[in-house]
Amino acid sequence: PLPSSSASFPTNVTFVAQDWMDGTVAAQYDLILCLSLTKWIHLHHGDEGLVRFFGRIVQSLRPGGIVAMEIQPWQSYSQARSLSRSLRVSHARLRIRPDDMEWILCLLGMTSLGPIAQGAGFGFVRSVCVFQAPPTQVERIPACFGWPWVERRPNKLAPPTPR
C-alpha cells in the first residue's frame, strides 16, 4: 500500500512478500502481482484454497485496484504432479481448471482487463492477465463463495442446481 505521506515514484512503492495462505491479510493494496504461483496454491491447497486465495485478493485490493496474474496452463500442472506422490493425489482431486479462473475472479466482482503481456524468455510463454477490483470496497466475500459453490459441468463451472 502507498503511505499517506508518500513522495513521488519510485519512493512511493513498497513491495511486500508474504504467504497469504497462512494467516490474514489486513492491508489494502493498489497492485497485487501474482507470477507463477496459482498452480502451486491450487496443487497444495486444492480448489477450496484457490477460491480462498482469489477471495483474499478481492478483499485486499483498494477500490479500483489491480491484480496482474500469470495463470499457468493445465499442462504445467501435469508436469508438476510428477514431483511427489502428494502432488499426484492433489492433482487428481482438482475440478477447477486454469480456463475457469477468469470466470471465478469475475464472479467475485473483478473486471477482466485482458492480457497485457506474453512472456517469451526462459521457457515461459504465458500471458499476464489483468483484473480490476470493484469501485467500492468489498467488505467480505459472501458465504456462498465458499467451496464447493460451483459444480463442474461439461467444460464449464456453473452455480449448483437448487434442490
State the predicted function of each range:
Residues D22-I32:
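A short acidic, Gly/Pro-enriched loop at the edge of an enzyme's catalytic core
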Residues G49-P63:
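A short glycine-rich, Lys/Arg-flanked "PGG" loop and its adjoining helix->strand segment in the class I
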